[in-house]
Curated annotation (Swiss-Prot):
Bias (Basic and acidic residues): 81-91
Matches recorded under InterPro entries: ARM-type_fold, Initiation_fac_eIF4g_MI, PDCD4
Protein name as catalogued: MA3 DOMAIN-CONTAINING TRANSLATION REGULATORY FACTOR 3
GN (gene name): MRF3
Pfam families reported in the protein's UniProt record: MA3
Alphabetical list of SUPFAM superfamilies matching this protein: ARM repeat
Organism: Arabidopsis thaliana
Disruption phenotype: Enhanced ethylene response, but altered salt response during seed germination and plant growth leading to an increased tolerance to salt stress. Increased susceptibility to dark and starvation, and to treatment with the TOR inhibitor. Decreased translation activity associated with altered ribosome patterns, especially in the dark and starvation conditions, in which mRNAs distribution is altered and rRNA abnormally degraded. Slightly early flowering time under long-day conditions.
Any Gene Ontology CC annotation: nucleus
Residue stretches making up the MI domain: 116-237, 280-401, 414-535, 577-697
Alphabetic keyword roster: Cytoplasm, Ethylene signaling pathway, Nucleus, Repeat, Stress response, Translation regulation
Tissue distribution of the protein: Mostly expressed in vegetative tissues, such as leaves and stems, and, to a lower extent, in roots and reproductive tissues, such as flower buds and flowers. Expressed in seedlings, roots, cauline leaf tips and flowers.
One GO term (biological process): negative regulation of DNA-templated transcription
Annotated localization: Nucleus; Cytoplasm, Cytosol
Top-level taxon: Eukaryota
Length: 702
């Protein structure tokens, strides 16, 4: 066979063979051969040989050399350059290498960190419900890490407890309070409850009373100070009105947090089976502090605090100790000594210390009613605590807080200036939606009570027209922006300064009583809110007398009708006279059909706050006289020109809705007509979304 080779090819084969013998096994002899073979040059046998040199590679990365007749002995140079496309691996071959067997890559399943967290959280929760050990649960959660997933822990904890007995529900609430600030930050608590509200529709499928139970958890979180009251209205705005989550928020606010003595009722709703009730713990803390102030035995006081076994509630010890120091100047030094010692022994953690100071700072306004110098004294205590090393400097009164306080004062000053302009514009335009937009643009919901105080103060010094507008606005704000607490706090501020107001406005006390009573009639406040307001005022003060007067007005005969007309129509006319004028202009419009003339007459009435009467009478006239299109055209034109606002439209429609049963006695199809009017109003944007929602809810109940 060598006769077929040229001298040059023989030499190349010799070199290749020698090189192959010297190479380690990992290097391939045929690759050396290929380096020495001449490049194809067009045709002939060289070209054919080159085309035949095709190498198959195994999955292991090795070239598989084809063998001829299973061998490749001496002189068989096909061993080096020939390939066999049908090469098969033979396990019985002496040269068999298992690494050349074909194999399949199998993808490994990657674990999801969130899934891992949820599994671990479920284990922690189940163990906690078995043992009731708060400290172990907190330690396990800290050890678990992945703090960004803590909202899911809250969702899991509450959702599991919802389907268990009251004991577990109470345990879940206690654990949430324990984890607050120390383990789970406030934003994560909030996010956890958002997840719960968003899942309320799913909970109802398995837990029939899920809305009520979740509402109670929400109320308990507010009472326990782990959720701010402002969370409720903000959550309600973010949720679809038809969702179960929205119902949860409404139930929490109206059924639990608006009741008299709601905090005590909510705290004891599940019986407190897990441990001593919160009220009992508070009483024990008060007893420990009172005894300590008398004896001055720091070690004994620390021992008693430790024996309470409520490390998650030590912020209450801090808060009550500080209140004691503010109330009794002689107690300040021993109280600070006690807190210093408790911090040094790690009895009270840094986060619990900060939380206690924060809670006191938030209640300074209320404390100032009984302790006028509370804010000043607290401002002196904070630097001592920070310099003593037992209050985190981030709390910040010495330096940062001073700057923040100045910024806060500046913000409040600007707010007061801006709202005066906004209120004046409202008195001129009666445009409630525009006022609400302006107030939202200020972005300071924490100052809502201040706005209410300024609104009524300005109205007091004006005519009945503006007083009626102020009451109407207050009702709208309560629907759109203000919480009941905002309104109550605003009236407290008004009544605290009632004596000063009376110096400028002689009848201020009587008119404030009317505003307060009117707020109750308009469902802005509940009657029991008057008791809460009175409890925050100095006994036997002008403010408490005003509240008593308001209460007597509310419970008088025909109080509702009288209070709704308490401002007499605003421009000095009797309400009945105003109604007659409105009836006359509508009848004239019915005869003439002149929309522009009717709008002119409405404008000349000069009673924008009473335009809901125009809406009501127009709708009723449309039903009675089958003048639907004519009356709807008038209302549309009035709305387009800005004569009748959304608020007045809504109020007019509401009044017609409330009187439908009586109307149906004379107009059998009154309800059908009214529904048609509502659809028309909805299409043209006349009425508020809250009104449409109330109609939907009433229909569902019916």
């Amino acid at each position: 066979m060598e006769g077929f080779l040229t001298d040059q090819q023989r030499e190349m084969m010799k070199v290749a063979t020698q090189t192959a013998d010297d190479l380690p096994p990992s290097q391939k002899p045929h690759s050396v051969l290929l380096e020495h073979l001449p490049k194809p040059s067009g045709g002939g046998k060289a070209s054919g040989a080159s085309n035949a040199v095709k190498h198959r590679r195994s999955h292991a990365g090795r070239s598989i050399r084809s063998k001829k007749d299973g061998g490749g002995g001496k002189g068989n140079w096909g061993k080096l350059i020939d390939t066999d496309g049908d090469y098969h691996i033979d396990p019985n071959d002496p040269n068999y290498d298992s690494g050349e067997e074909p194999f399949e890559l199998v993808g490994a399943t990657l674990s999801d960190p969130l899934d891992d967290y949820k599994k671990a959280a479920a284990s922690i929760i189940n163990e906690y419900f078995s043992t009731g050990d708060v400290d172990v649960a907190a330690a396990d959660l800290i050890e678990l890490g992945s703090s960004e997933y803590h909202p899911y822990f809250i969702k899991r904890l509450v959702s599991v407890a919802m389907d268990r007995h009251d004991k577990e529900k109470e345990m879940a609430s206690v654990l949430l309070s324990a984890l607050y600030a120390d383990v789970i930050n406030p934003n994560q608590i909030r996010d956890g409850f958002v997840l719960l509200l968003e899942s309320a529709d799913d909970f109802v499928v398995d837990i029939p009373d899920a809305v009520n139970v979740l509402a109670l958890f929400l109320a308990r979180a507010v009472v326990d100070d782990i959720l701010p009251p402002a969370f409720l209205p903000r959550a309600a705005k973010a949720l679809p009105i038809t969702s179960k989550g929205y119902q949860v928020v409404q139930t929490a606010e109206k059924s639990y947090l608006s009741a008299a003595h709601h905090a005590e009722l909510v705290e004891r709703r599940w019986g407190g089976q897990t441990r001593t009730t919160v009220e009992e713990v508070k009483k024990k803390i008060a007893d420990i502090l009172n005894e300590y102030v008398e004896t001055g035995e720091t070690y004994e006081a620390c021992r008693c605090v430790r024996e309470l076994g409520v490390s998650f509630f030590h912020h209450e010890v801090v808060k009550r100790a500080l209140v004691t120091a503010l109330e009794n100047h002689a107690a300040e030094a021993p109280v600070l000594k006690l807190l210093n010692e408790a911090a040094s022994e790690n009895l009270i953690s840094s986060s619990q210390m900060v939380k206690g100071f924060s809670r006191l700072r938030e209640s300074l306004d209320d404390l100032a009613l009984d302790i006028p110098s509370a804010r000043t004294k607290f401002g002196l205590i904070v630097p001592k605590a920070v310099s003593g090393g037992w209050l985190d400097a981030s709390f910040g009164y010495p330096s940062g807080e001073c700057g923040r306080q100045q910024n806060e004062d500046e913000k409040l000053k600007r707010f007061k200036e801006d709202i005066v302009t906004i209120i004046h514009e409202y008195f001129n335009s009666d445009d409630i939606p525009e006022l609400i937009r302006s107030l939202e643009d200020l972005g300071a919901p924490e100052y809502n009570p201040i706005f209410l105080k300024k609104l009524i103060t300005l109205a007091l010094d004006r005519k009945n027209h503006e007083k009626e507008m102020a009451s109407v606005l207050l009702s709208s704000l309560h629907i759109e922006m203000f919480t009941t607490e905002d309104v109550a706090d605003g009236f407290v501020m008004l009544l605290e300064s009632a004596e000063d107001t009376a110096l400028d406005i002689l009848d201020a006390s009587n008119e404030l009583a009317l505003f307060l009573a009117r707020a109750v009639i308009d469902d802005v406040l509940a009657p029991f809110n008057l008791e809460e307001i009175s409890s925050k005022l100095r006994p036997n003060s002008s403010g408490t007398e005003t509240v008593k007067m308001a209460r007597s007005l509310i419970f008088a005969r025909h109080a509702g009708e009288r209070l709704l007309r308490c401002w007499g129509g605003g421009s000095g006319w009797a309400v009945e006279d105003a109604k007659d004028k409105i009836s006359n202009l509508l009848e004239e419009y019915e005869s003439s059909g002149l929309v522009s003339e009717a709008c002119k007459c409405i404008h000349e009435l000069g009673m924008p706050f009473f335009n809901h009467e125009v809406v009501k009478k127009a709708l009723v006239m449309g039903m009675e006289k089958k003048k639907d299109k004519m009356m709807l055209d008038l209302l549309q034109e009035s709305f387009s020109e800005g004569l009748i606002t959304t608020n007045q439209m809504t109020k007019g429609f509401t009044r017609v809705k409330d009187g439908l049963e009586d109307l149906a006695l004379d107009i059998p199809n009154a309800k059908e007509k009214f529904n048609d009017y509502v659809e028309y109003g909805k299409k043209n944007g006349w009425v508020s979304s809250s009104f449409l929602t109330s109609l939907t809810e009433d229909a569902n109940v019916g």
